[in-house]
């Protein structure tokens, strides 16, 4: 960690352009920092490969600068995620004594959905997150990703990413960290 303006971006690009010399993925917390990485490549002689600098996840290049969200966006729903989330929620209802068995827990959820859709949706969202977190903690973080994030990762793998630069990584939450560990393994 160094103060703003101390040259971290330029140092990172130097390591990539002059030492590593492999396709790189730069991940940043926002689009302003993402664009900064691409813009600073103009300070280096890329031997005519300047056109291969990208900020578009659909067109990765020798250096692809993206936001963390482009490769870590979680899935929001889907039958399989919802099924597991509802099962987890039902187990909690039984543990807390709000339902006697699995069938009555499912009936409780259905009644809530019919009578208070907004609260039901809020609770389901909470249990989806718990399921995603549990999968990520147990080595299945890639399963938790939205289809667009998975597609972005596949395209990045095809260009042969040899270096991942994490800008502002000290701000990363556990979700991103777990996923990025698996992303590195996926690229290897």
Segments predicted by a language model, with ranges:
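N-terminal helicase ATP-binding lobe
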Residues: 1-188
């Amino acid at each position: 960690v160094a103060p703003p303006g101390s040259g971290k971006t330029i140092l990172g690009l130097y390591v990539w352009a002059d030492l590593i010399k492999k396709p790189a993925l730069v991940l940043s917390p926002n689009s302003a920092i993402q664009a900064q990485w691409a813009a600073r490549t103009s300070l280096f002689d890329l031997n005519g490969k300047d056109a291969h600098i990208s900020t578009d996840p659909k067109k990765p290049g020798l250096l692809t600068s993206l936001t963390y969200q482009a490769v870590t966006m979680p899935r929001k729903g889907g039958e399989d995620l919802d099924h597991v989330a509802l099962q987890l929620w039902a187990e909690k209802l039984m543990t807390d004594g709000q339902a006697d068995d699995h069938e009555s827990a499912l009936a409780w959820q259905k009644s809530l959905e019919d009578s208070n859709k907004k609260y039901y949706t809020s609770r389901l969202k909470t249990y989806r997150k718990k399921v995603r977190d549990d999968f990520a903690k147990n080595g299945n973080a890639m399963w938790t990703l939205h289809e667009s994030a998975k597609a972005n990762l596949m395209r990045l793998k095809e260009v042969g990413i040899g270096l991942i630069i994490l800008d502002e990584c000290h701000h990363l939450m556990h979700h991103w960290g777990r996923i990025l560990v698996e992303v590195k393994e996926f690229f290897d």
